[in-house]
Amino acid sequence: MSDGRGNLELDVSRETLERLMVFSEVLKKWNPKINLVSRKSIDDLWTRHILDSIQVFDAAPEGGAWLDIGSGGGLPGIIVAILAAEKSPDTRITLMESDLRKCAFLRNAARECGVSVTVKSKRIESAPEENCDVLSARALADLDNLLGFAERHLAENGTAMFPKGANWKKEVDNARKRWRFECDEITSVTEPGAVILKIKGVERV
């Protein structure tokens, strides 16, 4: 039976690959009930979503406390937890999601994959400050709003990891009207013109 990866080659251990495969099956099982990812993209789950999440982990600093906000379908949060179990076991991962059904999915997916995460059912803008070392968000909001969440939840020397599509330059220019920040753009391997924005030093203008 096909696992949906096609010819995709991943530089991970057999155990990590097995966990990723378990995650893909759990997501496909839950998706019709609570729409974790679009039906259009579910057939391209490995390259569109899983590989996209892997590159976020690979570009981020190692260790410390990692907060994924608007975790929804566990992308990148559960993928980060799967990779960290092998490559960075000291990383403490928190997934923040306001939808209770999606929180139930996240807990189930973590359990099925055998990884440790803390799932918090809270609204990002009103949750207590997390003081995390790494903050990630995927397909959640525009950069201006994401930087507001980063200012609230990142530790002083923390790093934000935000995958963005081909219009990322406009988002950066717009965000600079209200924010000062250092930004590295890492070219995405999953979508032409897309990047991962690696951001530090967030403060209001």
UniProtKB/Swiss-Prot annotation:
One annotated Gene Ontology cellular component of this protein: cytosol
Keyword field: Cytoplasm, Methyltransferase, rRNA processing, S-adenosyl-L-methionine, Transferase
UniProt-annotated location(s): Cytoplasm
Catalytic reactions of this protein: guanosine(527) in 16S rRNA + S-adenosyl-L-methionine = N(7)-methylguanosine(527) in 16S rRNA + S-adenosyl-L-homocysteine
Xref: Pfam families: GidB
This enzyme's EC code(s): 2.1.1.170
Record-linked Gene3D superfamilies: Vaccinia Virus protein VP39
rRNA processing in keyword set: yes
Statement: the UniProt record of this protein carries the keyword Methyltransferase: yes
Binding residue positions for S-adenosyl-L-methionine: G70, L75, I124, E125, R138
Disulfide bridges in this chain: none
MF-aspect GO terms: rRNA (guanine-N7-)-methyltransferase activity
NCBIfam families the UniProt entry points to: rsmG_gidB (TIGR00138)
Function of the molecule: Specifically methylates the N7 position of guanine in position 527 of 16S rRNA.
Similarity-based family: Belongs to the methyltransferase superfamily. RNA methyltransferase RsmG family.
HAMAP family: 16SrRNA_methyltr_G
Protein name as catalogued: Ribosomal RNA small subunit methyltransferase G
Organism field: Ruegeria sp. (strain TM1040) (Silicibacter sp.)
